Amino acid sequence: MKPMATRADVRRIALKLPKVAEAEVGFAFSVPDKKGKLKGFVWVWMERVVPKKPRVPNPGVIAVRVANLGQKSALLSAEPKKFFTEPHYDGFPAVLVRLDAVSVADLKVLIAEAWRCQAPAELAQHKR
């Protein structure tokens, strides 16, 4: 059985990618666009545990950017034990990933693809 992913794996994988910035507060990673604006590609899921109360970080789940809503739908349909969504993410190209259900190898692919979605084209092309 493949080892399941952890937040430490997320951090290690994300920080190996070019020009990645880790958030000073919270658990999130981004890459600057051409103008220097940070574009998030992986972050902790902020779960609403109690209705009408603030969302709280769920350390076992990350949100990962995907290329488009078609890819999101495909991931959600193919592996619902690994990937899910919630109404907050309706119409937004990201999936929620259960870390205890995804292998480190799969996590590497997800994070690299998420980074490519947000990185400037010239930077993303060098990483291929």
Residue ranges and their predicted role:
Residues M1-R128:
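Charge-dense, helix-prone N-terminal extensions
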